[in-house]
Amino acid sequence: MKIYIEGEKIRGTFQKRVNRFIAEVKVGSQLVVVHVANTGRMKELLTPGAEVLLRRVNEPHRKTNYDLLMVYHKGILVSIDSKLPNRLLYQGFINKEIVAFDKFNEVKREVTYGKSRLDLALINEEKELVLIEAKCVTLVKEGELASFPDAPTERGTRHVRELTEAVKQNIRGAVFFIVQREDAVRFTPNKEMDPQFQQAVTEAKKAGVEFYAYNCIVTEDYIAINDELEIF
C-alpha cells in the first residue's frame, strides 16, 4: 500500500497558520501562502521555524500555489494530508493486501449510510457489506503513542456512531486509524481532547465495530502503510 507524491516539491520554513486551511511559509526569501491539507490543529507540528515540504500547484481556480504536505519533526517526516488514508486503504483493498478483508472483491468510495458519508464500502460475492471509515492521525505523544483526534471532532464521532448502528443491523463496520509517521508503536483514542469520541469508540467496540491502526513509512517521494499497531 504505497502512494507516490507527485509534482514539484519544495522545502520551506513554517511561519504561522492563518486559519484552518491557510498558512504562511517562507521559501528562500519569499513569504508564500499555502493550502494546509488537514484541518486538525497539529500544534506540536506546525510551529514557527519548522521545516516543511510543499508541492507547487499551478491551477487557475486555486487561491494558493502551494500545498503543505509534510513536516520535518524530530528526525522524521510526518505527512499531514488528510486525504491519503482513504487512498491508501482503497489501494490496499483493491490489491487484497489487508488480510482481514481479502475476500471482498468490490470496493466503493464515498458511500452514504444514515446521515453520514463514509469513506469506503466492501462487497463480496455473497453480497455481504462492510462499511469502512479512515481517519488521518498525525499526533504522537510520549514518543510512541499515536492518538486521535487532536481537536474535537463531531464528524468523527458521528461516523463511529453510524458504524455502531450499522453493526446492530448485521452490517460489518470498521475504522482504520492511519498514523502518517513511522515512530508510533501504539494507538489510543484521545480522551483528553474529545471524551465524546472516546466514548463513541468504547460503545462501538462493545457493539462489534472493528478497529485497526497502522503507522506509515513517509519519505518525500512516497507514503506507505507499514506496521499494525496495538490499540488500547
Swiss-Prot record:
CDD domains xrefs: SfsA-like_bacterial
InterPro entries according to UniProt: SfsA (IPR005224), SfsA_C (IPR040452), SfsA_N (IPR041465)
A molecular function (GO) term: DNA binding
Cysteines engaged in disulfide bonds, as pairs: none
Gene3D superfamilies assigned to the protein according to its UniProt record, in alphabetical order: 2.40.50.580, 3.40.1350.60
Domain of life (superkingdom): Bacteria
PANTHER family for this protein: SUGAR FERMENTATION STIMULATION PROTEIN A
Assigned protein family: Belongs to the SfsA family.
HAMAP family to which the protein is assigned, alphabetical: SfsA
Protein name: Sugar fermentation stimulation protein homolog
Taxonomic path: Bacteria, Bacillati, Bacillota, Clostridia, Peptostreptococcales
